[in-house]
Amino acid sequence: PAEGTISVPRPSGEQNPRIAWVFQNPFGVRARSAIDHVALPLLARGMSRAQADVEANRLLDAFNLAHLATRPFRDLSGGEAQRVLLARGLACSPTLLLVDEPTAQLDQSTARDIASTLGSLREDGVSVVIATHDPSIRAQCDAVIDLAHFQDEEGQE
């Protein structure tokens, strides 16, 4: 696109728009469990611990991580940690999800699953902005901007 606008809805009664981001390097509090990481934004928004744990378990299950809910972050593989943080990013039902290299530390099968999950978020009204070098992720995107050459997918500068 050569021009246009981006608007981020600000739901009434909330201070901040629902924007979540997931960084390439899966940093977390090493001693805290996977479920603690996913529940954190829910607790910060005032959800009870019991409710937050139910929702966090649902999200962990969606990423095939329910069996790791109580495992400390330090004991997760790089791919598991990345998926925990993706689940955390989705915990507060963001309208905009910013993701940096979401498949960089994953095996091919898991990377395909993550790409599919990210692609399906648009059906839920979530806009996803992805920074990636992965051609399979790029192929699933509605629009691609090649920052290396400052061109969009049609070659326009």
Feature-to-residue mapping (PLM):
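Catalytic Walker B motif of ABC-type/P-loop ATPase nucleotide-binding domains
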Residues: 97-100
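Q-loop/switch helix immediately C-terminal to the Walker
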Residues: 32-43
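Conserved catalytic motifs of ABC-family nucleotide-binding domains
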Residues: 93
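Hydrophobic anchor residue at the start of the ABC signature
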Residues: 86
